[in-house]
A protein has these predicted regions:
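Conserved polymerase palm-domain catalytic core
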Residues: 1-38, 96, 155-159
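Histidine-centered active-site/metal-ligand motif
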Residues: 63-67
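C-terminal reverse transcriptase regions that engage the nucleic-acid substrate
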Residues: 26, 34, 45, 50, ...
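Short small-residue beta-strand/loop micro-motif enriched in glycine and branched aliphatics
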Residues: 15-19, 57, 115-116
Length: 184
């Protein structure tokens, strides 16, 4: 392996990580590449993978058992292991990466929707970026997202002073309402 790349020395000796440590700038990309390579035969056929979140989807229970077995075998071949307490097997409704996925369709996770109700009015450019970043993640559910966000987007233009006005308040309020009223 590549463990030598993480080596460091202290007065207590020479050390190398045996597992992927948190904090390395390329760790997420490297791990995603590993997961993609490991599960490549199944990607977009019956598997979606994002870092350590794996979604296995099937049309019936028998097919699902086969899919789960294939994925677990591939992970085992790559010396990757799952924690059973973090797994959900044979469910028809799952919360995955902030979305609720079920046979009837995809929706936003209710806890994400409820968090928007208490979101404070942005007081800086960074606050606007954080709010719009959150909203942008769910933009597929928000009709005319660009139009609704335009009031706040105006403040993100270069050399524009941060002055919160009626356009920005209307933009902020209408986006929050889209999440809360269920019109997403």
């Amino acid at each position: 392996g590549e463990e030598w790349k993480t080596a460091f020395r202290t007065r207590y000796g020479h050390f190398e990580y045996c597992v992927m440590p948190f904090g390395l700038s390329n760790a997420p990309a490297s791990f995603q590449a590993l997961m993609n390579d490991t599960l490549r035969p199944f990607l977009d056929i019956f598997v979606v993978v994002y870092l350590d979140d794996i979604l296995i989807y099937s049309t019936n229970e028998l097919e699902h058992r086969t899919h789960v077995t294939k994925v677990l075998e591939k992970l085992s071949e790559a010396n990757l292991f799952v924690k059973l307490e973090k797994c959900e097997f044979h469910v028809s409704k799952v919360d995955f990466l902030g979305y609720v996925i079920e046979p009837s369709g995809i929706s936003m996770s209710p806890d994400k929707v409820s968090s928007i109700t208490t979101w404070p009015r942005p007081a800086s450019i960074k606050d606007i970026q954080a709010f719009l970043g959150f909203c942008n993640y769910y933009r597929i559910f928000i009709e005319e997202y660009s139009k609704l966000a335009s009031g706040m987007l105006k403040l993100l233009k270069k050399d524009t002073p941060f002055i919160w006005g009626t356009d920005q308040e209307a933009s902020f309020t209408s986006l929050k309402e889209q999440f809360v009223t269920g019109k997403v």
